Every structure is written in C-alpha cells, then in structure tokens.
Design a protein with these regions (language model features):
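Bacterial Sec-dependent N-terminal signal peptides
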Residues: 1-25
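Alpha-helical segment of the N-proximal tetratricopeptide repeat
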Residues: 23-50, 54
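Short, conserved micro-motifs composed of acidic
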Residues: 26-27, 58, 97-107, 111, ...
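Residue-level recognition of tetratricopeptide repeat
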Residues: 33, 67-68, 114
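Structural motif corresponding to the intra-repeat A-B loop/turn of tetratricopeptide repeats
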Residues: 38, 72-73, 119
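TPR-repeat structural position
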Residues: 41, 75-76, 122
C-alpha cells in the first residue's frame, strides 16, 4: 500500500513539474525575444539554443536560431541547418512573440534563400526565393516583393561578378589591431600613419586609435574616455591631417553627427554639428572632403529619394556654419538605402555602399566620378571579391582609390570581423613583381638581362 501511494505521489509530482518546466522555458524564450528585438543576436542565440536542448525543438525556435546566426559574422553558414528545419512547418497564421507557436512564418523561406545567397549557394538561393514567392501567393501586399525580386537579381549579378574577379591583394592589420570581437569602421589619415576604428567589445562599443611607426602599427589606445562615450559613439571619418574626427551618435529615436578635435595629444569632447546637418531623423554617417569645405553625409530626412540618402553640405565661412544640404540626386540615391560615403583624395570620386544599385546581395560598395557641380557619373560596382554576397558597408579609400581599408570576416582572422587593407591593381595601378636571377627577353637575339 505504501509502495502504491509512493507511485501516485511520483506521478503527481511529475505532472506538476512539466507545467513548471514549460513556464521556465517561456521565460527563457521571452528573454531571447527581447535581445533579438534589440538586435543583440549574440545574447539571444544561446537562449534559443537552450530551448532546443531542453526539448522545445520546433520550427519556431529553429527559425529564430537561423535568424540569429545569419546576423553573426563567422556563423552564417550554420544558419542553413536550422532554417531548413524551420521551413518544414510553415504556419501562414504565425503568431509573432508567442511561445506556444510551434510553426515558422512564411518569411522563414525568404531567410533560407538569404542564407543560401550569403553562403554563395546561388542556384539554391534562386530556387528558394521563387518558392517564397509561391508561398506568399495572393498575400503579396503583406511583403516587400520588390525587395525579394531585387535579391533574385542580385544572385544573377553575383554570378557575373564572381566569374570576373578584380585583382587585389589583402593585408590583415594583425592581432595588435584586431581583437577577438567585431572590429569595424576603419578610417585613416592621408599618409596612413594613423587609424581610428570601432571595436564591439563584450560590454560596450569602443573607439580606438593606433599610430604607425617604422611601418608597424602600435598598440591601440582606447579613446572612449576622452570622447566621453557611453558606447553610443562611432567614428565615421578623419580629415586629411588626422586631427579632426566625425562621429555618429546613436540615440534611442534618431542618430546625429558629432565632431571631435585632437588638441595637445588628446581628443576633445565631441560637439554636435548644426541643424543643417542634423535633423530629427537619422543621420548615420559623415565624411570630410579633401579641403574640408564640404561634408557628405547620410540621412533619412523628409524629401529624400529613398531610405537613407547621401547629401552634401558646404561650409559657410561668413556665418561660420554648415550650409543647407543638397541631395546628390537619383544618379546616386535610389529608393533603397545608400550609406557610408567617402571622397577620394583628389575629390573627384565618391565611394559609397548601396542596397539599390546593381549588386551581389544586400549592400555593395560602388564608386562614381564627379562630372560637374553636384553631378556624378553612373555608379560602378567595385567588384568581387571586395563585394560579396553578404552586406559590404564600409570602404575607406586611400591613394585615390587604388587601395582602401574595410572590415570583413575571414576564416583565418583574429576576430568576428577584422580590419584589412586592400590594394586594387589595374592599368592605373599595375602590380609590380620582383625577380631574382636572369630572364630571357628574346629567343632569337638570346639577349639576357639581370633580374631585379
């Protein structure tokens, strides 16, 4: 009888334990959702994975894991496994934010297509994007189908560009510059003796500076205390002397451009630029031109052509303020987003990132030549492998565009993203080759010259 009573008690306890386990799991889920909504994917990912390990393995959780992995450099190839599982159970009436939801939304199919594209599986990406369009069916008004079609075209463009790669040489700036985290937004002074960049550390985003001596970069100095940042300031450009820095400040509801000056070997507390640069909307990037008489910046203010547009403002020396900005026009700006403009040393070429021009996927880097006052040539895709099937957002040109600095993930790198210097070889910048010994110039004359 005692044994029978013990068994009944054990069964009752097990029934009570299950609702408690589910309640605990729901709390983990809500925490993960919170981090994901604030785009803190590295915080959200282990929580979603915990749910899988605890037995809550369903299409919904697999979808969220795949989504997170697609946003973390170095882990994007792992997203395919989870998104493939997610699309096996699509729920067209998907309940966003519900732990009880076991299915995945139709949008999971789009994410699978994106995962194939990012991982250069272009045939599978095209097939999956078409499947997504079929799944959407008559509900096209609920989805941005223009963007889906643009992704399809970008896969086709990627095929073309990957068949004809440009000639480059890539130099990783090394472990002294690159931390184990994401090292991004590299900007340099004209002679490349000073670099400033942002590193996304574990607890905050920090701005660093390094000086080059004897052709070697020194230990980076954390500028965050000098510029009095709470992790919300990000460098965007340097002037040619490297003693004035523009920064982007991320506020809860908008972004603003600030400026800091180097005085007595220290950077001043940044001050906000005037109302002609900063609006109540998002200003996300700004750069100086060579003579520092103009600032090119991005903004999604009213009256633009697309999302973020590129504008230019000229300094009014009489009134000592930046003048009213001019939109660079439809030759540069598209109905999508343009970002991170930089001007070449001679002031004749603009480099920028765009979602709207003919690219390989997401943002690509383009350049256009100045052909008149606020007039530009048709933008040219800088080419593969500088551009990839992923987002490529930041290219700081040096040597009039024959080289540049950018951040990217590399399998043999030091961090999630490393800062690299890329030399671009062309007719205007031919690759030089050093040889030792002798080479034969003419088979008939048998003339030999010493190698160099």
């Amino acid at each position: 009888m005692k044994k029978f009573a013990f068994l009944i008690t054990a069964v009752i306890l097990s029934f009570n334990a299950f609702p408690q386990a589910e309640k605990n799991a729901e709390e983990v889920f809500l925490d993960a959702e919170y981090y994901r909504l604030y785009e803190e994917y590295e915080e959200a990912l282990p929580l979603y994975q915990q749910l899988i390990n605890e037995g809550f393995d369903n299409a919904h959780i697999n979808y969220r894991i795949g989504e997170c992995l697609l946003e973390i450099p170095g882990k994007k190839d792992n997203s395919l496994v989870y998104l493939k599982k997610a699309v096996d159970n699509i729920n067209k009436k998907f309940k966003e934010g519900s732990f009880k939801e076991k299915g995945a939304p139709v949008y999971a199919v789009f994410y699978l297509g994106k995962a194939y594209q990012v991982n250069e599986k272009l045939d599978k990406a095209l097939e999956t994007y078409e499947t997504f369009k079929e799944k959407v069916g008559d509900n096209k008004d609920n989805y941005n189908m223009d963007f889906v079609n643009k992704q399809i075209e970008s896969c086709k463009t990627a095929r073309e560009l990957m068949k004809n790669p440009i000639n480059i040489e890539e130099e990783n700036l090394g472990q002294i510059i690159n931390s184990p985290y994401q090292n991004i937004k590299p900007v340099v002074k004209n002679d490349e003796s000073r670099i400033i960049f942002t590193s996304k550390l574990k607890f905050y985003d920090a701005v660093f500076m390094s000086e080059k001596k004897d052709n070697k970069w020194g230990p980076p100095q954390n500028l965050t205390p000098q510029i009095k940042s709470d992790g919300d300031l990000y460098n965007t450009s340097l002037n040619k002397e490297g003693n004035e820095m523009l920064l982007f400040k991320a506020n809860p509801y908008n972004g603003e451009i600030y400026k800091s000056t180097r005085e007595d070997n220290k950077w001043t507390e940044p001050h906000k630029l005037g109302k002609n640069i900063n609006s109540k909307y998002w200003e996300t990037h700004a750069c100086f031109c060579e003579d520092e008489n103009k600032i090119y910046f991005t903004s999604n203010r009213r009256g633009g052509i697309g999302g973020l547009d590129i504008y230019v403002s000229t300094y009014d020396r009489k009134n000592q303020e930046w003048g009213k900005p001019k939109n660079l026009g439809r030759q540069i700006n598209t109905p999508y987003n343009e970002e991170t403009p930089f001007i070449s040393k001679d002031g004749k070429r603009i480099y920028f990132s765009s979602q709207g021009h003919k690219g390989m996927g997401g943002f690509d880097i383009f350049y256009a030549d100045k052909i008149g006052e606020n007039k530009w040539s048709k933008p040219v895709n800088i080419g593969y492998p500088i551009n990839t099937t992923d987002d490529d957002l930041f290219f700081c040109p040096v040597d009039n565009g024959n080289a540049g600095y950018m951040a990217k993930y590399t399998k043999d790198g030091y961090g999630q993203k490393d800062i690299v210097r890329i030399e671009i070889f062309s007719k205007n910048n031919p690759r030089t080759i050093s040889l030792e010994g002798s080479i034969k110039l003419d088979e008939h004359k048998k003339k030999m010259i010493p190698g160099k």
